[in-house]
Amino acid sequence: MQIKISEIENKNNIIDIRTSTEFNEFNIGGRNITRINLLRNPEYYLDKNNTYYIVCNKGTESLSCTKILNALGYNCYSVAGGIDDLKKL
């Protein structure tokens, strides 16, 4: 359920659930969709035939979000360590 940033196959399928301000300051590509919007309307943002990579600051919010989305039938992975770990590189 977790994946390293280097293992992401399609950066177009990255979903960054941080605030738009955080996303604009530093991002790894993909789309910025707040966690609440993503969980309220996953069918609007996601296709059950695709794989998505959920990222947040530390990896904890993305992991909980990923668990919920996977339970709903979506194929999602949480980016381990989040943006904070990536900034340390």
Pin down the residues of each PLM region.
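Catalytic cysteine-centered active loop of the rhodanese-like fold, especially the PTP/DSP P-loop
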Residues: P42-K87
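Active-site loop/turn elements of alpha/beta-hydrolase fold enzymes
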Residues: I17-T19, R35, G81
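Glycine-rich, highly charged phosphate/nucleotide-binding loops
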Residues: I33-N41
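Phosphate-coordinating loops and pocket residues in cytosolic domains that bind phosphorylated ligands
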Residues: E25, R40, K88
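Glycine-rich nucleotide phosphate-binding loop and flanking beta-alpha elements
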Residues: T21-F23, L39, T60-S62
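Flexible, polar/low-complexity N-terminal or interdomain linker segments that lie immediately upstream
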Residues: M1-G30
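Hydrophobic anchor at the start of a short beta-strand
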Residues: N12, G30-I33, Y52, C76-Y77
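Residue-level detector of functional hotspots within protein domains
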Residues: M1-I3, D16, L38, L46, ...
